[in-house]
Curated annotation (Swiss-Prot):
Protein name, per record: Large ribosomal subunit protein uL10
InterPro entries, sorted: Ribosomal_protein_uL10, Ribosomal_uL10, Ribosomal_uL10-like_insert, Ribosomal_uL10-like_insert_sf, Ribosomal_uL10-like_sf, Ribosomal_uL10_arc
NCBIfam families in the record: PRK04019.1-1 (NF003095)
Bias kind Acidic residues: ranges: 312-330
GO terms, molecular function: large ribosomal subunit rRNA binding; structural constituent of ribosome
Recorded superkingdom: Archaea
Swiss-Prot/TrEMBL keywords: Ribonucleoprotein, Ribosomal protein, RNA-binding, rRNA-binding
GO cellular component, one term: cytosolic large ribosomal subunit
Length: 338
């Protein structure tokens, strides 16, 4: 009677076990992490970026299955991450909030070569000058792309700047090869975050994109609205009281001028108001009694000096509101998830 064969359990490589343990520790240690797409990002540029941001962000490239296992081990729901973990990914661990991290990465872009079939992001110009390339089969590529050349010594010289592609054009094999031979790297790439995890909340890429101008305008308008309301109710804080007192002073002057209440401070405005009323009356009388020959001069009304001061104050407040930095906006939005 033969014994039933028992299949041997597949042995998991030690490096995978250690990697999962390390990632699990990172997921538990950092309140914020992001999963980013590494597709097309040059390795040498990634190393430079890793070094530049080493004090703020920890970079880690790992296998997608190992990332998922580590997430589960750390007690994090993987349902939304499973569909995102395709292709080559980069893990970013930080103590900044997710919005700060996104803004930080947006500042760093790298240049790489275009590949055949890709779409030109900008106008591509082959510059005039010595290419350093020896004459040979490549001359047919220059000819096909309508780039004027001449031979000087043992080098190909481009005789004038030539536009070989415009934004939206598809890059041909010949052009991609020539750009690489000429060391013209024009394609702009950056690390794109797929999703971020901030203190238990998953934030997808679209939600991390900030319209900074819109937020600045919102902050500025909210600040100005607060000043208006505060000055209306005379909220007892130094910044508001100054506006409220200016407003009350102007209203008091207007009331005194209307009531004819004369003091050293109001005399000018009382008399001016009286003169304006008299002139208005004279103008009206002259319509019905032109024989009187009344000549009514035009006098420009005087604005109390306090109004100018208030306008200057408002301009200062607007300038202060406009100085809100990207980091402050990111911190404020990040606080919603803290």
């Amino acid at each position: 009677m033969s014994a039933t064969a028992v299949p041997k359990a597949k042995r998991i490589p030690q490096w995978k076990i250690e990697e999962v343990e390390y990632l699990t520790t990172l997921f538990k240690s950092y309140p914020v992490f992001a999963i980013a797409d590494l597709t097309g990002f040059p390795t040498n540029q990634l190393q430079k970026l890793r070094k530049k941001l080493s004090k703020k962000v920890l970079f880690r490239v790992s296998k997608n299955k190992l990332i998922l296992r580590a997430l589960r081990n750390a007690g994090i729901d993987t349902s939304k991450f499973e569909e995102l973990l395709t292709g080559q990914n980069l893990l970013l661990f930080t103590h900044m909030n997710a919005f700060e991290l996104s803004l930080l990465l947006d500042k760093y872009k790298a240049k790489t070569y275009y590949k055949p079939g890709e779409i030109a992001q900008q106008e591509i110009v082959i510059p005039e000058g010595n290419t350093g390339l020896s004459p040979g089969p490549i001359l047919s590529t220059f000819s096909k792309l309508k780039i004027p050349t001449r031979i000087q010594g043992n080098s190909i010289v481009i005789t004038r700047d030539t536009v070989v592609a415009k934004p939206g054009d598809t890059i041909s094999e010949e052009l991609a090869s020539l750009l690489q031979r000429l060391d013209i790297a024009l394609k702009e790439v950056k690390i794109n975050i797929k999703a971020a995890y901030d203190h238990g909340i998953i934030i997808l890429r679209d939600q991390l994109v900030l319209d900074l101008e819109e937020y600045k305008n919102m902050v500025m308008n909210a600040h100005l609205d607060a000043l208006k309301i505060g000055s209306e109710i005379a909220w007892p804080v130094p910044e508001i009281l100054e506006l409220s007192l200016n407003k009350a002073f102007r209203q008091a002057l207007a009331l005194a001028a209307e009531a004819g209440y004369v003091t050293p401070d109001t005399a000018e405005y009382v008399f001016r108001a009286a003169i304006m009323k008299a002139l208005a009356l004279a103008a009206e009388v002259s319509k019905y009694a032109p024989d009187l020959g009344l000549e009514v001069p035009t006098i420009q009304p005087t604005t109390p000096p306090e109004k100018k001061e208030e306008e200057e104050k408002k301009e200062e407040e607007e300038e202060e509101a406009e100085t809100v930095s990207e980091e402050e906006l990111a911190e404020g939005l990040g606080a919603l998830f803290g």
